């Protein structure tokens, strides 16, 4: 019975991954276009680029996961470990890039232009090696946990790389959400006297939203890992496994919100597109009416 449940559940999860890939690719391309093309993109642009790059790797791994979960592909465990490392590294890399982008945004509020340029250069020299090293070490720890689990399990199927344990989800929640947010909150507290009320509320709002979404994505799988979800509710295990995929949506949105000064660009672009579409529709109907009138005049003549 358990085998039948698994065989029915994996194709549904694979289909969900496919839809997530389609919509997340469209969203990621839209966020990059809005950030680079239609905004000033002056504050933290390097960190925004690194965040989008990390999430693009994570997004384009979704079709591979889809093929593995559906059973169409079969890969050795070592290659699964490589995919798992890239997946985790991209998440941590994007999360820590967001941290330094938030610090850059706070410095933009606190300092004048000469001091801001000096602090930005110093921060860029320090942050990129830190981001690479921390992300690599954190992803390596997750990889070691997977190898230990894979050795104890006799199933040679590659989707074991994507069945995360509750302990792994706790680590991901702490490493990619809790610690980065707490560090930025500490930095805000140290610069509290230099920030205006509106600026402080803007940054703290973004951090709280990121903390909430990250907790929603990782906490159910981490907290309910010991429960046999197949016996409680059919498909609950797949929901828990699919929730962490939400990061491909909220991390690019947070990068866009922190990197761009004008957040009304999407609204204005949609309004312009709708106005142009209405103009074209009205012009076409007007031409059709004029052509019918001309035909009627010719018939009368």
From Swiss-Prot:
Topology feature Extracellular, residues: 1-15, 70-82, 144-168, 221-238
Subcellular location, principal: host cell
SUPFAM superfamilies membership: Family A G protein-coupled receptor-like
Its membrane topology: Multi-pass membrane protein
MF terms (GO), sorted A to Z: G protein-coupled receptor activity
Transmembrane segments: 16-36, 49-69, 83-103, 123-143, 169-189, 200-220, 239-259
GO cellular component: host cell plasma membrane; membrane
UniProt xrefs under InterPro entries: GPCR_Rhodpsn (IPR000276), GPCR_Rhodpsn_7TM (IPR017452)
Keywords: G-protein coupled receptor, Host cell membrane, Host membrane, Membrane, Receptor, Transducer, Transmembrane, Transmembrane helix
Gene3D superfamilies: Rhodopsin 7-helix transmembrane proteins
Cytoplasmic face of the membrane: 37-48, 104-122, 190-199, 260-301
Subcellular location: Host cell membrane
Family: Belongs to the G-protein coupled receptor 1 family.
Protein name: G-protein coupled receptor homolog U51
The organism of origin for this protein: Human herpesvirus 6A (strain Uganda-1102)
Gene: U51
């Amino acid at each position: 019975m358990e085998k039948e449940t698994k065989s029915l559940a994996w194709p549904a999860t694979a289909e969900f991954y496919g839809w997530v890939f389609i919509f997340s690719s469209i969203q990621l391309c839209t966020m990059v276009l809005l950030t680079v093309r239609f905004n000033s993109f002056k504050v933290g642009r390097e960190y925004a680029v690194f965040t989008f790059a990390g999430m693009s790797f994570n997004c384009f791994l979704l079709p591979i996961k889809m093929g593995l979960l559906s059973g169409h592909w079969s890969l050795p465990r070592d290659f699964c470990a490589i995919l798992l490392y890239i997946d985790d590294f991209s998440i941590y890399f994007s999360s820590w890039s967001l941290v330094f982008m938030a610090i850059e945004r706070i410095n933009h509020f606190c300092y004048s232009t000469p001091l801001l340029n000096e602090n930005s250069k110093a921060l860029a020299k320090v942050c990129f090696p830190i981001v690479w090293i921390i992300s690599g070490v954190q992803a390596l720890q997750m990889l070691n946990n997977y190898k230990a689990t894979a050795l104890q399990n006799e199933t040679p199927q590659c989707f074991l790389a994507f069945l995360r344990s509750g302990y792994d989800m706790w680590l991901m929640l702490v490493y990619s959400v809790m610690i980065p947010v707490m560090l930025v909150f500490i930095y805000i507290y140290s610069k509290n006297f230099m920030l205006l009320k509106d600026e402080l509320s803007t940054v703290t709002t973004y951090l709280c939203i990121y903390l909430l979404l990250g907790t929603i994505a990782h906490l159910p799988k981490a907290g309910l890992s010991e429960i046999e979800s197949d016996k409680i509710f059919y498909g609950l295990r797949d929901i828990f496994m699919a929730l962490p995929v939400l990061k491909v949506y909220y991390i690019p949105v947070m990068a866009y919100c922190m990197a761009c000064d004008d957040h009304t660009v999407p609204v204005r672009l949609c309004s312009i597109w709708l106005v142009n579409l209405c103009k074209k529709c009205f012009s076409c109907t007007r031409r059709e009416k004029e052509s019918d009138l001309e035909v009627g005049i010719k018939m009368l003549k």
